[in-house]
Amino acid sequence: MEELETIAKEFGGVRAAFAVQAGREVRVIASAKEADDNVAAKICRDIAAAYQERLSYPGEIKVVVIRESRFTELAK
C-alpha cells in the first residue's frame, strides 16, 4: 500500500495520497492552485497508467483525485 501512495506522490500537483480498502482504492489530494479540473483528470489517468505499467496486482485499483478550494470568513 505504501508503494501505491509513493507512486501517486511522484506526480506534480499532488499534495497527498492515501491507499484505502486494502489497496483497492487510492485517494489523491491535488493542489487546487496547481491543478485545474483538466489537470486533475490527467493526473488521475496518469496515476492509473503508472500502476498498470509498474505494479502487479489482482483485480482493479480505483484512483480518485480530489481537488477542492475552501474559503472561510468569520463575522464578529
Where are these regions (language model features)?
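Residue-level signature of catalytic and energy-coupling elements of molecular machines
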Residues: 8, 28, 63
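A short interface-forming secondary-structure element
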Residues: 26-41
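Flexible, glycine/charged-enriched surface loops at secondary-structure junctions
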Residues: 16-20, 55-62
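Flexible glycine-/small-residue-rich
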Residues: 21, 30-32, 65-67
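Short, non-transmembrane amphipathic alpha-helical segments
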Residues: 4, 39-59
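Short, low-order "capping/linker" segments at domain edges
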Residues: 69-76
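A glycine-rich beta-turn/hairpin centered on an aromatic-Pro dipeptide
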Residues: 1-7, 34
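Short acidic amphipathic segments
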Residues: 8, 14-17
